[in-house]
Amino acid sequence: MNLLQKNKINLRPFTKWTGGKRQLLPHIQYLMPEKYNHFFEPFIGGGALFFELAPQKAVINDFNSELINCYRQMKDNPEQLIELLTNHQRENSKEYYLDLRSSDRDGRIDKMSEVERAARIMYMLRVDFNGLYRVNSKNQFNVPYGRYKNPKIVDKELIESISEYLNNNSIKIMSGDFEKAVKEAQDGDFVYFDPPYIPLSETSAFTSYTHEGFSYEDQVRLRDCFKQLDSKGVFVMLSNSSSPLAEELYKDFNIHKIEATRTNGAKSSSRGKITEIIVTNYGN
């Protein structure tokens, strides 16, 4: 996709997402390889970098199956999705939100179609507190209703643009483990890892936006996957916190420290300026 096409359809993330990278895009793009073949993003989240690059050939993945279902429904059923979101917008209230949220507690969600589930999540992310996606140990959504005067629940133009892009390019959409998502990566491809971050302190639990969580062992496994891709000639980039553990794990590679502004935490004290790292296996 050339620049004119990208500007015409105005791609951007369809939702806020914890750890979203929109503000870090200049840093990331500066450190990216100049040329690459396929693009892989195993922790796609809101897709800030993916939509900015708008690659013609890509594999996107996330272990959050509800999130990935949103991508699939925007691709396959955009008009029905828009219709359902329009209904949610018409009915929107705190009571309506809490009732819809409780559908993963009383079994109603199991009777929903895939597009209905996508509309549910996309609606809740537009009106809940700070745009958070958070579930408890039973995989039940537990974010309270937000205080927005006039939230934009239906973005028809954006959904149609994303659908057009996903259908007109070779984009493989997966939901599962990051290792499976990069199995096909070859020499000259580019992989960007944006995993749940290693906590900066003992009081911060390992981030979990799926009920399965992402453990220390997963972080080590990710580092080993990074090394394996490096040995295959793949360009690899990874974002993480500027924690001693992260710097120790990636000490054999190039570590770039950048200042970021965290804007999507549950507590106001967790938002603000913070140092992060971008790791690359190639020179810049």
From Swiss-Prot:
Q: What is its EC number?
A: 2.1.1.72
Reactions catalysed, as given in the entry: a 2'-deoxyadenosine in DNA + S-adenosyl-L-methionine = an N(6)-methyl-2'-deoxyadenosine in DNA + S-adenosyl-L-homocysteine + H(+)
Q: Which InterPro entries is this protein grouped with?
A: Ade_MeTrfase_dom_2 (IPR023095), DNA_methylase_N6_adenine_CS (IPR002052), M_m6A_EcoRV (IPR012263), MeTrfase_D12 (IPR012327), SAM-dependent_MTases_sf (IPR029063)
Keyword annotations of the record: DNA-binding, Methyltransferase, Plasmid, Restriction system, S-adenosyl-L-methionine, Transferase
Q: Does the keyword S-adenosyl-L-methionine apply?
A: yes
Q: What is the top-level taxon of the source organism? A: Bacteria
Q: In which residues is S-adenosyl-L-methionine bound?
A: 17, 21, 62, 194
Q: Which GO BP terms apply?
A: DNA restriction-modification system; methylation; mismatch repair
Gene Ontology MF: a single term = S-adenosyl-L-methionine binding
Note, other: The LlaDCHI restriction system has two different methylases. Genes encoded on plasmid pSQR700 confer strong resistance to the three most common lactococcal phage species (936, c2, and P335). Its presence is probably one reason for the strong bacteriophage resistance shown by strain DCH-4 over the years.
Q: Which family does it belong to?
A: Belongs to the N(4)/N(6)-methyltransferase family.
Protein name (database record): Type II methyltransferase M1.LlaDCHI
The gene coding this protein:
llaDCHIA
